[in-house]
């Protein structure tokens, strides 16, 4: 495992440990999302973890899928292991673009949609898969668990 990847393991584990401590201290008791962390909050948790990793200079992509009525979300490190698809520029009508921008949108609206093939070689970071009996913190490559989704 590369040094960079070991740092990601460290950061992800620190983040998960902190979230577990917050849960155990009952800070999340009245929180609709995190009250039973790490269960049933993989999407929101992945968004928070993405912000945290981003603050450490680690760009990520949000990935999610569904399998037999269950959904799951995780991150993929956006580095040289991920294929960057060609952006599809979407032309928005001026009125909609102005409305979008007024709510904090970006001036240039690009829709980049990654496919499974684009991210299949990427490094997965997942701190909520233990709700499915997987590892406490998973930093690694696609396996049978992630292929299901």
Language model features: what each stretch is:
Residues 1-149:
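A structural boundary/capping signal
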């Amino acid at each position: 495992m590369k040094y960079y990847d070991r740092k990601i393991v460290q950061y992800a584990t620190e983040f998960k440990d902190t979230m577990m401590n917050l849960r155990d201290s009952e800070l999340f008791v009245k929180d609709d999302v995190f009250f039973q962390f790490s269960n049933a909050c993989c999407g929101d948790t992945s968004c928070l973890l993405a912000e945290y990793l981003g603050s450490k200079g680690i760009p990520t992509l949000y990935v999610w899928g569904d399998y037999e009525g269950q959904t799951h979300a995780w991150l993929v490190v956006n580095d040289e292991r991920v294929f960057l698809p060609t952006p599809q520029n979407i032309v928005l009508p001026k009125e909609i673009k102005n409305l979008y921008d007024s709510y904090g949108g970006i001036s240039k609206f690009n829709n980049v949609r990654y496919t499974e093939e684009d991210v299949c070689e990427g490094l997965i970071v997942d701190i909520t898969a233990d709700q499915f009996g997987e590892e406490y913190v998973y930093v690694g490559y696609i396996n049978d668990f992630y292929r299901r989704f």
